[in-house]
Amino acid sequence: MINNYIDITVRLLENILDNEADYVKEAGAKVAESIENDGVIHLFGCGHSHILTEEVFYRAGGLAAIHPILHEPLMLHEGAAASSVLERKNDYAKTFMAEEDIRPGDIMIVLSTSGRNPVPIDVAEIAREKGAFVIVITSLQYSASQKSRHTSGKRLSDTGDIVIDNGAVKGDAVLKSANFDIAFAPTSTVTGAVILQSIFAEAIETMVNDNFTPPVFISGNVENADAHNQALVDKYNERIPLLGMNL
């Protein structure tokens, strides 16, 4: 099974390279432009998609201007099944997005593989209303196979200024066994992480080419990194309180 899973995942990544690279580069350019103008990069996902927002937050080799919107009832640790129920509620996003410090010039990255549930769609639209540029990471194939649960009939892909397709199959899982009817082994976390890291790599290279110093963290386990990292925390802590919370 390991060979099958890795083979399929590699093919998905190759498809992303072949078909989505221009969108990734465009997204990277917008991220660079935002950071060069004191913007913040917000990310949101429900359920397992929220994992990707934490993958790029306070990350060694990653950008400091990253703000994951972590609404705990929509994560997993306060009730996994309950989070799925909430994700399907129209207008629920208004209960937490109203207080988010999203400004014109910021970037909002919204992740949902199915792209059918109301909360990610509403998050994208509220962020746009606040002036953010919206980047969506979703599966166009999966999304097209399912009816939208949003009252407008929209899917997440309808809300993005840039839409990047992670290529996930319907249901996300890619493996099957002859003696088992349910597909297993999802791919969207792997492809999502690659897409995000590629966007930010493009952004960092763009900033370097613009003679702008990218705000990149050094691993805290490398000697003499602490002062560098603390300066970045201090720089962004007002906009991203999660960076310095509880210190």
From Swiss-Prot:
Q: Which GO terms describe its biological process?
A: carbohydrate derivative metabolic process
Q: Which domain of life is it from?
A: Bacteria
Q: Which SUPFAM superfamilies match?
A: SIS domain
Q: Which residues form the SIS domain?
A: 31-214
Pfam families given in the database record? SIS_2
PROSITE patterns hit by this protein: SIS
| Single GO MF annotation | carbohydrate derivative binding
InterPro entries in UniProt: RpiR-like_SIS, SIS_dom, SIS_dom_sf, SIS_GmhA/DiaA_subfam, UPF0309
> NCBIfam families per the record?
PRK02947.1
Q: Give the family this protein belongs to, as stated in its UniProt record.
A: Belongs to the UPF0309 family.
Name by which UniProt lists this protein: UPF0309 protein LMOf2365_2617
Protein species of origin? Listeria monocytogenes serotype 4b (strain F2365)
Which lineage do the record's taxonomy fields give for this organism?
Bacteria, Bacillati, Bacillota, Bacilli, Bacillales
